């Protein structure tokens, strides 16, 4: 099975997502790894910086701005009211989740969870778009199979075994959409591969 990887610029707008969808729907089964939409991870880092500095007002301002941008992407990406609604609900749940971190202690652990949201959103958006187009696509959660060892290097045996389990849950899928950049560490905590580390 082919594995294709698209970085943030490739999925940086609704139009670019549609172009990627055309490229990947050629009748062959494949796993498609997506980054966050371009600029998203940097913005999430900026939000995290405000939270480290105990400035929830600054963080919320940037969160609201980013959410508005995503609502526009949703409007441009989907053609039907049903999928526009699904997309808006998706965005709301992720941004409400990010906002929940403005109220409590913020550490490196919370930052890693916040940074993971970009990939989780972009892959869910693409999965919905493919489904709206009638493609049998499935979201493969990277957090269920992607793990690093105690040296922060990918754990190939674990990854292969767990990925196989995930694939077997959806034998009829044509396209498997999954996240780059995010993983769990050797202790099961949400972690991030190094920037560019999705190439693993």
Residue ranges of predicted features:
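Nucleotide/pyrophosphate-binding catalytic subdomain
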Residues: 1-200
